[in-house]
Design a protein with these regions (language model features):
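A short beta-loop-alpha structural element at the N-terminal edge
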Residues: 1-14
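Active-site rim helix/loop that mediates acceptor-substrate recognition in acyltransferases
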Residues: 15-60
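Conserved beta-strand in the GNAT
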Residues: 57, 63-71, 79-84
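A conserved beta-turn-beta hairpin within the catalytic core of GNAT-like acetyltransferases
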Residues: 72-83, 90, 142-144
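Conserved acetyl-CoA-binding loop-helix of GNAT-fold acetyltransferases
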Residues: 85, 91-104
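Conserved GNAT acetyl-CoA-binding A-motif
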Residues: 106-119
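Conserved catalytic-core motifs of GNAT/GCN5-like acyltransferases
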Residues: 115-117, 127, 132-151
Length: 158
């Protein structure tokens, strides 16, 4: 098993085919969506595009079997986005490995919280890693719902 940073082009191929097939909106390296539960941010913030996104992949026998990405959405909030694990390799710890890399990057960038908007079907992997749900499931504005907001507080000093 090899876990490593990958390029946007590499992750985009997986996202296009596996995670978001026939997606209507363009797949970009970032999302401008904000965490809506603290303060009163606009739903979208184009300043998010100032932050660098990072992309990770997990390889087994030189085959890309899992991906995730992350980027800050504020100076202290980090979004986990686009996790996918090949059906054959699910429930084998790959999502947890990807979340670990995401959390480590968030800590390196000085964030104290990670958030995401998983599909209902992916929620168990998030809960296992320590994410908590916020609010209820929703479909509005999501092409592959229902989705739910999740967050995890992280200790930057650990």
């Amino acid at each position: 098993v090899k876990a490593t940073k990958i390029t946007f082009e590499e992750i985009c191929n997986v996202w296009n085919v596996e995670l978001w097939p026939e997606r209507v909106s363009a797949i970009e390296p970032h999302s401008a969506m904000t965490w809506p539960f603290e303060g009163s941010p606009e739903q979208y913030d184009m300043n998010i595009f100032e932050y660098n996104p990072i992309f990770w992949g997990v390889y087994i026998d030189n085959k890309l079997v899992g991906v995730n990405s992350g980027h800050r959405t504020t100076d202290t909030q980090y979004r986990s986005r686009g996790i996918w694990v090949n059906q054959q390799y699910r429930k084998s710890g790959i999502s947890q490995m990807l979340f670990n890399m995401t959390e480590h990057q968030a800590i390196l960038e000085g964030c104290d919280m990670i958030w995401s908007i998983p599909r209902k079907s992916a929620l168990p992997a998030y809960i296992k890693f320590g994410f908590e749900t916020v609010g209820d499931y929703f479909d509005e504005g999501m092409e592959f719902g229902p989705n739910i907001y999740v967050k995890k507080r992280i200790n930057v000093n650990s």
